[in-house]
Amino acid sequence: MARLAVIPTIILALASSSPALSQPDTDAALLEQIRQDVSADRIEKDIRTLVGFGTRHTLSETDSETRGIGAARRWVYEEFNRISAACGGCLEVSYQSDFIEGEKRIPNRTEVVNVIAIQRGTMDPSRYVIMSGDIDSRVSDVMDYTSDAPGANDNASGLAGVLEAARVLSKHKFAGSIVYAGLSGEEQGLFGGKIMAAQAKEDGWRITGVLNNDMIGNIEGINGVINNTTARVFMEGTRMNETPEEARARRFYGGEVDSPSRNLGRYVHRIAEEHIPNLDVMMVYRLDRFGRGGHHRPFNDLGYPGVRIMETNENYNRQHQDLRTENGIRYGDVIEGVNFNYAAKLTGLNALTMAALSRAPAPPMNVSIEGAVSPDTTLKWAMPNVQGTGNLAGYKVYWRLTSEPTWTNSRYVGNVNEATLENIVIDNYLFGVAAVSKDGFESPVVFPGPAGDFYPFHPTKP
């Protein structure tokens, strides 16, 4: 359980005449090495293997060694173990499951099984960042568990990205823990995510972010657009489990666009902007596509920060379709619809984001703000007293105009727990604080108050 570290209070006025403190340089070489290590060829091989199981429908057979979701999940388990063997046993590989029945899309008792691999952090192992992809697939009839459902893009591409990220990141050490998750039951009702999120809450995980990868390989949209230089990150606004008291505070003090998920999405956007050539990330202020859902949602439902990363241009002729040709149009989620280089680019985005998040210190907690009827704005915060604070260098305050989507102004203030921005009027800007490691990696920015709190299940009061 998180407690608060005692840090001397230093009020630091950031007037233009004040000497600027130097933030440690980010280890950009590490991120570039990770980006270059991602292999489109390995991703293609994994997608072809997953497609080769015929169908991966959640209700499909589990006894066959060559067909169905049972064979597919066993292969994923074995692949994680092969990756672990290559890094000297650095991954903890396990199955995670529960029985589901009486549901519209799972009427009969069915075991929904996830495959999880954990790369433990060296300094703060109880802090987690999660990358997920889905094992299961479907055709037009969501209850058809016998027809071929290759699911090449939806979602073998996302699961292959998870496996490739594990191969690349397992070569390195990180302060926080990284979780690589193959989730099942997505098409039947997000059950794999529900199982994992509930277990994470029960086990007291401090989750900095969930990166749900669902369809990361298509570049040819049904609208005729062909584009391999953009991606989308979907991120919810107000927390699902916000209390009436928290809603009232948000109404008066703001935070509608600064939930932890929104600031996690901004983090992903910044990683792409600074480290991924020819990739523009579109930040979409929605939980998911219009009226639709993905495996980040069960985590959001419990208050955890999570986003969906995916292609920009979808082709609905290739989603949830029986394999067929009608009026000269080929339907079905087949391997020919996947661009492996693009899938590798989005896998790299995930890998770099997880590397930066896991190298950074834990996000600050108890972030508060004051400055009404004053020319100045003061931010205060604390660092949770958990393992891993030894890599903390200091903090960085951020601010932006209320109409701006990303953080545009910042100042590194050192290892203090309070900073005053002189002549920055509180009414005109939004504010936040990030923790910075000794090798220059930053946590996500934390907006003041409950609306921006990254610790929904841990004490946020001294």
What is the predicted function of each stretch?
Residues 34, 42-120:
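A non-catalytic alpha/beta surface segment that caps or lines the substrate-entry region
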Residues 51, 216-237, 283-359:
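Active-site-adjacent mobile loop/cap segments within catalytic or ligand-binding domains
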Residues 117, 131-132, 136-137, 141-190, ...:
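Alpha-helical metal-binding/catalytic segments enriched in His/Glu/Asp
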Residues 183-297, 302, 306:
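Metal-dependent peptidase/peptidase-like ectodomains
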Residues 375-390:
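Conserved aromatic anchor
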Residues 409-416:
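Short beta-strand segments within Ig-like beta-sandwich modules, predominantly Fibronectin type-III
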Residues 421-443:
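Beta-strand-rich modules
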Residues 438-462:
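Extracellular fibronectin type III
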